[in-house]
Each structure stands twice: as C-alpha cells, then as structure tokens.
C-alpha cells in the first residue's frame, strides 16, 4: 500500500475518538496460522494493513484477528470458513475456497480477496459475483474517507 494512504489511515485511526475502529496489530504467527488453516496466501497489502491496524475500519470493516470493538469479534478465519460452508453450493464457491473473506457488506454478502489479489463481492441471494477492485489497496482507496 502506498505510504500516503497508510499515513491517511494512521492519522484517522489513531484519533482518540476513533479508538473503537482499530484493533491490535496481527502477529506473523497469527498470519501464518491463518494462511495454513485456510490454505491461502494473504496478499501483501492486506498483511501490511492488518500488521499495522489489526481488524479496522477503512471505509468498510476489514477483519483480521483482533478487531476494533465496533467491528466485532469474528476473525478472517471464522468468516472464511463460515462462508465456505454456507455458500458451498453457489456458483462462486471456488472463489471462496481459494480466497479469504475480509469483510461483509450490509446485506451479509462476503467480500473476498482471491489468490491474484483481486477483491470480489459474492451475492448470496442471487449467486452473482462482482469485481469490486483490482487490489486491496484499490478497494481501500475507493472506500476510505476521513470524517
């Protein structure tokens, strides 16, 4: 992720009034264990984000292992395994099997990073899948704004 974007995120998330939006930084051990459990390799931009902020809000809730209290306790592992099981009959099941769920939209649809680093949303009601961004960094650039 660009240094400029990381600085914007740090300035926003380190404000005292935003303390519930940022979690605890992920450890290398947590990341390695999750990658092994999910049989994936996390994209370097996602790793940079969660090693800096943990699970945090950046225009959307980004789940990791220790999330900001306003985000919830589910981890990236919990969400990925849950959606892989729930949506195993959908046409996009392979995307879920090969990727990992980093967020959920307001309708309960998983937002997934695939092994190429592209970000998709999987609509559980219609069975459709849509490309949201070409990378995690592009997703955050599109979604994040300071208030």
Residue ranges and their predicted role:
Residues 109-115:
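Broad, structure-driven detector of short, well-ordered beta-strand segments within folded domains
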Residues 36, 125-126:
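A generic, residue-level signal for flexible/boundary positions that often mark functional hotspots
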């Amino acid at each position: 992720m660009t240094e400029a974007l990381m600085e914007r995120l740090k300035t926003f998330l380190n404000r005292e009034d935003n303390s519930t939006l940022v979690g605890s930084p992920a450890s290398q051990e947590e990341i390695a264990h999750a990658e092994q459990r999910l049989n994936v390799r996390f994209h370097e931009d996602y790793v940079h984000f969660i090693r800096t902020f943990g699970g945090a809000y950046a225009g959307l809730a980004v789940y990791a292992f220790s999330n900001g209290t306003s985000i919830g306790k589910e981890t990236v592992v919990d969400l990925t395994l849950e959606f892989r099981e729930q949506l195993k009959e959908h046409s996009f099941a392979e995307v879920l099997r090969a990727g990992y769920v980093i967020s959920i939209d307001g309708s309960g649809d998983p937002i997934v990073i695939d092994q190429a680093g592209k970000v998709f949303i999987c609509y559980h009601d219609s069975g459709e899948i849509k490309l949201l961004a070409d990378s995690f960094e592009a997703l955050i650039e599109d979604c994040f704004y300071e208030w």
